[in-house]
Amino acid sequence: MSIKFTTLLAVLFALLAYARAQAERRHKLTRPVHRFAPNRPYLAGKRIVGGFVINISDAPYQISLQYDDDHNCGGSILSSKWILTAAHCINDNAPSKPTVRVGSSKHASGGTVIRVARIVPHPMHGSKNNYDIALLELKNELTFSEKVQPIALPEQDEPIEEGTMGIVSGWGLTLSEADSNDVLRATNVPTVNQQECNKAYQSRYGGITDQMFCAGYKQGGQDTCRQDSGGPFVAKGKLIGVISWGHECALAGYPGVYARVASVRDWIRTTSGV
C-alpha cells in the first residue's frame, strides 16, 4: 500500500513539474521583444533589418546609449543638454550611469562621448511597455555641428496619419552576416492602422495602447531590431516615435511598435524645458 502511495506521489510531482515547465515556456514565447540585445548580464537591446548604411550627418540627432563603453540602445538629441530614449533601455542595476556617443557614424569610435548626469523615466512607465519614454540630462552641453543637431518634436496629441513614411535608424541587429551593424543604418517604413496593429498583437501581448503606434510592411522584411531600442522614428522633420518593441524582427504581420512622442509632449516640456 505504501509503495503504491509513494508511486502516486511521484507521478503527481512529475506532472506538476511538467505543467510548470510548460507554463514558463509559454511565458517566454509570448513576451514582447524589446528593441534592445544583451552585451552584459544586466542589459538587453535590437537593430535595423532590411536597411541601408547612412552617415551621421544624415541623422545628426542620432546617439548611441552605452553602458561600460558598449552600445546598447539608441536615442535622439532634443537640445544641448537633453536626450530622449526608451525607458526600458535604462538599467537601475548598472554599476554606473550610461554615456552617450554623438557625432559619429560608428557606435564604437569617433564623435564625442558624454556622461549622463540624470535619468528621468516617464512616471507612468511600467512592465507592459506603456509610456516607454525616458529623458537623459547630460553632464556637459553638446556643441552643435553638421554631425550633431537636435530634432524637432510634435505638439501634444498631434495625430499621425496612417501610411506616414518615416525613417528609423540605429546600430541594431541586421539579421544578415553581409550587413554589418558597426556603422549607422536606416530604413523607411510606413505607419499602419492602429486597430489593425492592435489586432495583430492582441492574442500574444494584449494589444497596444494609445501611447503607442506601429510601422512596417505587411510582408515584413524591414524593421528595427535588437539594440535599436530608444532610437528615432522621424517623419516630416519631427521625432514622432521612439523605437520600443515588437514580435521578433521584420516578421510578416507584426509591425514594429513605437512609443508615441506626441502623447508625452507636455511632460517632455515640463521636465526638460524643451
UniProtKB/Swiss-Prot annotation:
This is Trypsin-5. SMART domains: Tryp_SPc. Residues 22-47 form a propeptide. The active site is at H88, D132, S229. Its EC number is 3.4.21.4. Disulfide bonds join C73-C89, C197-C214, C225-C249. It comes from Anopheles gambiae. It catalyses: Preferential cleavage: Arg-|-Xaa, Lys-|-Xaa. The gene is TRYP5.
